[in-house]
């Protein structure tokens, strides 16, 4: 049996590329297409790349498409796709991104890449890091995980006594200086896998005088040796310094054996004789005697150094030894012959000695070849250290065994975390196709994905197959390319016939109808072979009857459907996004909802142009999980927004003092950076006064009827009770009870704290108006009424999930202010305030007459409400907006925090929230120059963003508890007129390009009017020779001589299976069609 050796087969290895990063962050890889044992020869395919299959260029998918409009979602160039493309990963791509981090030096020290981060020592954030603090290969990381651990010193190191340092070293303790965690983390919205890590060591200066160096060369040799010495004159007489990690103490007898190594060119370097000329070379006998005498007299040890050839021009071995005497003559000589123990040194002629000298040459301009470290002399000892740690220092011809040196290696020779100066880490992530991605065909038909529908909602074929993509039919005449229609229909035929086609360009050379005839013939063959009659209909070729996936009804018109080759382009959605980050919240009728949880069914708070607050359903919501770009961050005490640069902000000029909403306008964030602008936090709530009716209850089989409440009194009572009241079922003893009005005893008790005088005064006035009697009990007012108790019990104090009732949102703006001010009264401190004056005034006058005056006098700056209920805190912020003011939410005390009160420690069982009510200053300004409390910056960002579109284009949003009005997330620029083409190409604000005017004309006027315009006015403008329009005006017979562009348009419309033709009436007024092919 013949083997590879008998056949003289030489194995050839090919290195395949696996998941390499491209310049556009895509992945490049090779996939083998052959197996071991297969026979291949020159020209055979061995592997495919990421963009090929079977050796052919392949970057897309053959999918089922249809040219039809669908609810406006594929308007203009928009594309509607099925969720099958997402779930089946037909357009899922792998992207590789590089993240790097480096260490820098600050005034307090040098940053360090390490795993030892004290602040995270007791957490699980460091589990996936290796000993150097770098994420391990293959680790799956998500948003916020550490890629590379790094610490930055924030204060200078303190000097520690030596005995303290010794004590800490013995016990293994480390002194923790002030450091900051500056680790590199995974950006927002990213979940990826670590596939490659590159570390770079620190680059230390290898010589003190890096600029002044000289080179050592040998002219007689075919190679050259380059190392560096100081150029200063004072250093010329110093010993040549070379360093090596590998050094061995050896005697002179060991050194003498070097002469007998085979093929080892030798250099002997002595001291103090580099520039001296060798005049009298010793004779054979004297030389022998001198050398052996030196050998016998010496008992000291010498150093032997050896460096394997690193570069192609380096010699194999370099030897150096230092003579035992301080003033030994130095000689350079080279001998290429092989010596043995018997052979003595030969006397060299002057020419030979001159040629074999290694001379030192000083060059002003030289190129750096290699660096061999700096001089290190200690007590007359010289060592040699190369700057290439991976270089082997032992050659095969050396008598030193490599294993002897390998035993001396330890962990210190390898890369330590303290030596790492920078790290490049590569993450691989999968990106599925999403809304906003750009797709294109092979004929210039590109577009943006606008919606992803469930496959059951997509239109489907007569056999039940749902389509994968819906394209706008108006994109065909605008592209001026009929090839996409032919490809679509031919793909449908090839799918059912199992065939592939290669169409030669310019196939019209075979006939004027070559493409059309070939496509129709293949469709007919598919119909005959499969028995599916719907594949080809002679009366309407190329069109199919499709059914609506939502209703099952058939569409009125037949639709062009087939298979086409569609490509997903590089992700370009980032530049067209008008979005906010996920940490924003939106105000709805359901309360404050995170931006990523808002649905089109929610009613979002929006602002009209006149400043009126209304609630509307969002028209659309967009989510882009892989946004990568810059964000605009603006923050001060009343404002906090983090948006994309294209997001429109609702602002006005800072110099305008008026509070009218007319002056506000929507401006992109990138256009207001650094400018003095004012934002808006308030709105006008246009509601009629609301009348509250207390629901009826059943008590002891008796129905207590509904009760209509006095609204002014009820709002103040309810506002105080929601802050300081609770419902009890205990029976209160008669002790410590003072009867204010006699009332029947009842176990259903409503109790309100009256520790503050102003609260007591208000309750004394409003409770009798409401028709209740009350008692005093331990600094509390108690009301015994089952009907009131039953309604107020779910809203009792101490319930962490309580919220305002629904009827509150039907209050008018004045009523909302009364309720809000009553709630804040409980937390208002001070005496003789405007509130107390208003309360005392209301005790003397009727509440209805004092009510407007009460609102005017209660304007105060420091108004706050405190609660442990998150829902209630959000409701109060919304109530402030209904009142024409605004509210900022702050987390005052976190759950579990400890506070001291009267010498006792109190542990918070819930989060304590403070809502700051702002009544007057609701136009926060930025970049006004008065103080530097605000912050404005443009930050790099990668992660998820959300886009919200509302009809009024302005909605209410908050971040970190600070609410403000902001602009619509997505906008379309002004539309250009149909008959107007912008100069200098495409307009930046939505203008059409040449060829798109016909599309708009067809859509607006209809095909007949458009053809009339093109046939008359346009044709005259283009050619300047036709007189059709004059003939129409003067009612003369028309002469058909249309331009070539009109013929192209007619052909494309016919390719869409539209019945296009020119008809002429004969003498009998019978229309007869004119052959288009004979025109022009």
UniProtKB/Swiss-Prot annotation:
Enzyme class: transferase
GO terms for cellular component: chloroplast; DNA-directed RNA polymerase complex; mitochondrion
Catalytic activity: RNA(n) + a ribonucleoside 5'-triphosphate = RNA(n+1) + diphosphate
Record's subcellular location: Plastid, Chloroplast
SUPFAM superfamilies: beta and beta-prime subunits of DNA dependent RNA-polymerase, Hedgehog/intein (Hint) domain
MF GO annotations: DNA binding; DNA-directed RNA polymerase activity; ribonucleoside binding
Protein family membership: Belongs to the RNA polymerase beta chain family.
Stated name of the protein: DNA-directed RNA polymerase subunit beta C-terminal section
Lineage, highest ranks first: Eukaryota, Viridiplantae, Chlorophyta, core chlorophytes, Chlorophyceae
């Amino acid at each position: 049996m013949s083997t590879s050796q008998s056949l003289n087969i030489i194995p050839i290895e090919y290195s395949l590329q696996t998941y390499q990063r491209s310049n556009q962050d895509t992945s490049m890889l090779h996939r083998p297409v052959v197996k071991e044992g297969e026979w291949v020869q020159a020209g055979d395919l061995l592997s495919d790349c990421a963009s090929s299959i079977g050796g052919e260029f392949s970057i897309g998918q053959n999918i089922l498409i249809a040219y039809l409009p669908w609810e406006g979602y594929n308007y203009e160039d928009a594309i509607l796709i099925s969720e099958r493309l997402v779930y089946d990963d037909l357009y899922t791509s792998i992207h590789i991104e590089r993240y790097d981090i480096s260490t820098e030096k600050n005034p307090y020290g040098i940053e360090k890449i390490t795993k030892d981060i004290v602040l995270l020592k007791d957490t699980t954030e460091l589990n996936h890091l290796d000993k150097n603090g770098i994420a391990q290969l293959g680790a799956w990381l998500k948003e916020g995980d550490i890629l590379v651990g790094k610490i930055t010193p924030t204060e200078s190191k303190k000097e520690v006594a030596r005995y303290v340092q010794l004590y800490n070293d013995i016990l293994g303790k480390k002194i923790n200086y002030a450091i900051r965690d500056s680790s590199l983390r995974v950006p927002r919205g990213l979940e990826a896998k670590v596939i490659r890590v590159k570390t770079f060591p620190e680059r230390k200066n290898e010589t003190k005088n890096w600029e002044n160096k000289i080179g050592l060369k040998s002219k007689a040799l075919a190679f050259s040796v380059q190392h560096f010495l100081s150029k200063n004159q004072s250093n010329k007489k110093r010993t040549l310094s070379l360093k090596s990690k590998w050094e061995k103490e050896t005697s002179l007898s060991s050194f003498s054996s070097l002469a007998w190594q085979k093929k080892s060119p030798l250099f002997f370097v002595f001291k103090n004789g580099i520039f001296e000329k060798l005049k009298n070379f010793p004779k054979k006998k004297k030389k022998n005697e001198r050398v052996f005498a030196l050998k016998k007299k010496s008992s000291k040890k010498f150093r032997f150094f050896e460096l394997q050839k690193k570069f192609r021009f380096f010699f194999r071995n370099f030897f150096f030894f230092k003579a035992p005497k301080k003033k030994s003559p130095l000689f350079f000589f080279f001998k290429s012959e092989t010596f043995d123990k018997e052979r003595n040194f030969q006397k060299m002629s002057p020419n030979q000695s001159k040629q074999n000298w290694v001379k030192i040459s000083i060059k002003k301009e030289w190129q750096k070849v290699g660096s061999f470290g700096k001089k290190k002399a200690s007590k007359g000892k010289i060592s040699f250290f190369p700057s290439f740690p991976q270089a082997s220092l032992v050659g095969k011809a050396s008598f030193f065994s490599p294993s002897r040196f390998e035993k001396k290696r330890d962990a210190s020779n390898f890369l330590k975390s303290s030596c790492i100066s920078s790290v490049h880490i590569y993450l691989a992530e999968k990106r599925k196709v999403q809304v906003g991605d750009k797709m294109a065909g092979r004929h210039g038909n590109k577009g943006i994905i606008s919606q992803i529908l469930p496959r059951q909602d997509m239109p489907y074929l007569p056999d039940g197959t749902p389509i994968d993509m819906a394209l706008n039919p108006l994109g065909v005449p605008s592209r001026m390319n009929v090839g996409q229609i032919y490809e679509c229909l031919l793909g449908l035929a090839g799918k059912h016939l199992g065939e592939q086609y290669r169409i030669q360009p310019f196939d019209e050379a075979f006939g004027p109808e070559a493409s059309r005839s070939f496509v129709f013939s293949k469709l007919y063959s598919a119909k005959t072979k499969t028995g599916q009659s719907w594949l080809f209909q002679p009366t309407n070729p190329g069109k199919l009857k499709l059914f609506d996936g939502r209703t099952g009804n058939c569409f009125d018109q037949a639709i062009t459907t087939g298979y086409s080759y569609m490509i997903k382009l590089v992700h370009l959605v980032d530049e067209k996004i008008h979005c906010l980050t996920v940490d924003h919240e939106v105000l709805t009728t359901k309360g404050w909802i995170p931006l990523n949880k808002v649905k089109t069914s929610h009613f979002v708070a929006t602002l009209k142009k006149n400043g009126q607050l209304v609630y509307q359903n969002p028209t659309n919501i967009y989510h882009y999980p892989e946004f990568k770009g810059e964000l605009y961050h603006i923050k001060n005490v009343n404002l906090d927004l983090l948006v994309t640069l294209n997001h429109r902000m609702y602002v006005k000029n800072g110099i305008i003092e008026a509070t009218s909403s007319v002056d506000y306008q929507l401006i992109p964030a990138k256009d207001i950076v650094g400018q003095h602008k004012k934002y808006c936090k308030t709105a006008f709530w246009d509601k009629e006064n609301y009348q509250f009716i207390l629901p009826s209850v059943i008590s002891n089989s008796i129905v207590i009827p509904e009760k209509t409440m006095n609204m002014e009194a009820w709002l103040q009572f309810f506002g105080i009770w929601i802050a300081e009241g609770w419902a009890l079922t205990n029976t209160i003893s008669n002790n410590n009870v003072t009867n204010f009005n006699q009332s029947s005893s009842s176990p259903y008790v409503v109790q309100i704290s009256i520790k503050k005088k102003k609260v007591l005064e208000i309750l004394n006035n409003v409770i009798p108006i409401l028709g209740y009697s009350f008692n005093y009990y331990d600094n509390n007012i108690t009301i015994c009424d089952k009907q009131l108790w039953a309604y107020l019990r779910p809203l009792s104090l101490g319930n962490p999930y309580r919220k305002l009732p629904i009827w509150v949102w039907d209050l008018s703006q004045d009523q909302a202010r009364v309720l809000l001010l009553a709630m804040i009264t409980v937390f208002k401190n001070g005496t003789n305030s405007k509130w107390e004056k208003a309360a005392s005034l209301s005790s003397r006058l009727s509440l209805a007459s004092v009510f407007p005056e009460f609102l005017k006098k209660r304007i105060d700056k420091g108004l706050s409400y405190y609660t442990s209920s998150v829902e209630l805190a959000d409701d109060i912020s919304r109530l402030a907006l209904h009142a024409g003011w605004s509210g900022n939410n702050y987390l005052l005390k976190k759950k579990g925090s400890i506070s001291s009160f009267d010498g006792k420690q109190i542990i918070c069982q819930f989060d304590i929230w403070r809502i700051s009510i702002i009544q007057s200053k609701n136009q926060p300004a930025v970049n006004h120059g008065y103080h530097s409390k605000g912050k404005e910056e443009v930050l790099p960002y990668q992660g998820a963003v959300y886009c919200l579109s509302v009809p009024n284009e302005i909605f209410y949003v908050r971040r970190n508890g600070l609410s403000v009005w902001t602009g619509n997330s997505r906008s379309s620029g002004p539309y250009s007129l149909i008959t107007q083409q912008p100069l200098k190409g495409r307009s930046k604000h939505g203008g059409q390009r040449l060829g798109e005017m016909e599309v708009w004309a067809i859509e607006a006027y209809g095909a007949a009017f458009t053809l009339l315009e093109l046939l008359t006015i346009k044709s005259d403008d283009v050619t300047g020779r036709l007189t059709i329009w004059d003939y129409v005006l003067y009612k003369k017979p028309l002469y058909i001589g249309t331009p070539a562009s009109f013929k192209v348009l007619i052909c494309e419309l016919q390719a869409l299976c539209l019945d296009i033709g020119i008809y002429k009436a004969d003498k009998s007024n019978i229309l007869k069609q004119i052959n288009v092919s004979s025109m022009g």
